Amino acid sequence: HRDELLLFDRLVGKGGAVQLPVIPVRTPGSRWISGHYCDEFAEAHGKTLVVREALGAALPLAGVACAIDRQIIGRIAVRAGGRPFDDNSLTEDYELGLRIGSAGGRTIIARILDRNGELIGTRACFPDSMTASVRQKTRWLTGIALAGWDRLGWQGNWAQKWMLIHDRRS
């Protein structure tokens, strides 16, 4: 969206990170597979992240449509030996979002309309074949539900722990 950078500039200093909605685009001819992803992301970015932010739990980043404040990424880098993006992680964007919360930052989910009434966000296509879908879901399940226990533990307040249960259910 043409206003993304302006919105990032306006909001990133207010919390530590900004996540714009990911607006799912269904791949023609892939109603069931691509459509399934569209439904999941619409649910996550339309409701779950909004509730998560309201509860004060850390927000996972989507890997697209996000901006991170330099000070918070610097704090994370210091804690991580100069490497804020962990290349050993299967879900580095998800983990980075939670680490922003652990470092004292707050991610803002910015559901804001432009002057024409259009949602400011990033459109994204999702896997459209069974093979690509299984590969993606396996990475997410392994990275969040299984490795997340060891990599991130169960830290945070009750809202954070509740959302970790939500994330890690399989």
Residue ranges and their predicted role:
Residues L55-A57, R115, L119-S170:
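Basic/Trp-rich segment in TM-proximal cytosolic loops or flexible interdomain/linker regions
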Residues H1-R115, I120-R123, S129, R135-T138:
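Internal catalytic domains of large membrane-associated glycosyltransferases
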